[in-house]
From Swiss-Prot:
Keywords, ordered alphabetically: Amino-acid biosynthesis, Aromatic amino acid biosynthesis, NAD, Oxidoreductase
Known catalytic reactions: 2-amino-2,3,7-trideoxy-D-lyxo-hept-6-ulosonate + NAD(+) + H2O = 3-dehydroquinate + NH4(+) + NADH + H(+)
Highest taxon of the lineage: Archaea
Provenance organism: Methanosarcina barkeri (strain Fusaro / DSM 804)
Identification of the protein by name: 3-dehydroquinate synthase
Family, similarity comment: Belongs to the archaeal-type DHQ synthase family.
Disulfide bridges in this chain: none
GO molecular function: 3-dehydroquinate synthase activity; dehydroquinate synthase activity; NAD binding
Gene: aroB'
Length: 380
């Protein structure tokens, strides 16, 4: 679930015109706005969003300084014959040496500008490139050229359709887009396109329940999110990183308690939770942490922790078999705690029995500090 960012370009025209773009971006979840130095303070008054600005120093207070406007990058000044003689590259290098986040801005007019952009990207945190009448080929080349460098490629687009194309180029696509549009709907659609690209599907399969055994008292973790979940949506939880159960949110009413669709009563404190392509311990989660919400079709989206509650409750051991692999989870022993069945319908652990089929996620390889590694490991 690689994050795709959307920057809003708001450096041309009057402030009132740009203000509408910025406000829409803020309300829709844009990741950054690119403005002129004199407008940085005005953006701060509108809301809390990272700001990038054009310049060669960090006096504006913006989080990111972008080099290239009115320079070599946009064609105002001629390209140098040698990289060492580039005013833009030298300015970007000086900023980065001062530990300032720096972006390079290049309008790709021909092959020479593409080559210049590649060199600029090697000294920047962000490389912002826009095309003239050609798009996919230079972006492919830049992604391939810079894949070994710690730089995020932001591609200039005018609408959501161009953004989707940029996100899908090669296997990785652009890291983000810089949207230059005053159309309110295009801003919303482009941000939505970015979120859709992040929400790749997770492959789920069914496992057969082989053991359901009540345990004694233990500490379990309840994750209250800032998001409302539907039937069949929840989180992947397990005692082994190699296999996790889809634990349903408390999105259904019960005879005992009203629905709390923001909650996943997730499991014992030792349990793993899958977040993106990593795992964490449930007991590590804190307010504001990102989590991955997954439904029975494997569709995933990002959520955020609003509150974590660790309380002593009666526990239940659940084991299941998928092929020749055994996986387990320890959940609270209560009617409201549910796994997701093979058909997508929740099954209460209070009614779970041997032979029932539930949805799980299987992983290959071991984990080290939550990251997948190639290593032999046995978890029981």
């Amino acid at each position: 679930m690689k994050k795709k960012s959307v920057w809003i370009k708001a450096d041309e025209g009057g402030w009132e015109q740009q203000k509408e773009r910025i406000t829409t971006g803020l309300e829709s979840g844009a990741d950054c706005v690119l403005v002129n130095p004199g407008d940085v303070g005005k953006v701060r008054e509108l809301g809390n969003i990272p700001v990038a600005t054009f310049g060669r120093d960090n006096k504006s207070g913006a989080e990111i300084i972008v080099v290239g406007k009115r320079g070599e990058g946009d064609g105002t000044k001629p390209l140098p014959l040698e990289t060492q003689g580039s005013l833009d590259i030298n300015a970007a290098t000086l900023l980065r040496d001062k530990e300032v986040a720096v972006g390079g801005y290049v309008i790709i007019k021909d092959k020479r500008y593409e080559q210049f952009a590649a060199e600029m990207g090697k000294v920047c945190d962000f490389l912002i490139v826009t095309g003239t009448d050609w798009k996919v080929i230079p972006l492919e080349n830049l992604i391939a050229e810079l894949q070994r460098y710690d730089v995020k490629i932001i591609f200039g687009v005018k609408n959501a359709e161009e953004a989707r194309l940029a996100f899908k180029t090669l296997e990785t696509g652009a890291d983000g887009v810089l949207l230059n549009s005053g159309n309110i709907q295009e801003i919303k659609d482009t941000i939505q396109a970015a979120r859709e690209m992040e929400n790749e599907r997770t492959e789920l399969e069914s496992a057969v329940i082989t053991r359901v055994e009540p345990l004694g008292m233990g500490d379990r973790v309840c994750v209250d999110t800032c998001n409302l979940m539907q039937k069949g949506e929840g989180m992947l939880i397990g005692s082994q990183a190699s296999g996790m159960f889809l634990v349903n949110s408390e999105s259904d009413d019960s005879p005992y308690v009203a629905a709390r669709p923001f909650r996943v009563n997730a499991g014992a404190v030792h349990s793993y939770i899958k977040i993106g392509d990593k795992t964490r311990y449930l007991s590590e989660l804190r307010t504001g942490d990102a989590v991955t919400i997954i439904d029975s079709k494997g569709r995933q989206r990002e959520g955020f922790v609003g509150r974590v509650k660790i309380e002593s409750r009666p526990l239940m051991l659940i084991e299941a078999k998928a092929g020749n692999r055994t996986l387990s989870a320890i959940l609270q022993n209560a009617e409201t705690i549910k796994l997701v069945g093979k058909d997508g319908n929740p099954i209460s652990v209070a009614k779970l029995k041997k032979g029932d089929e539930v949805l799980v996620r299987l992983e290959e390889g071991a984990r080290h500090f939550g990251k997948k590694i190639e290593e032999t490991i046995i978890e029981k």
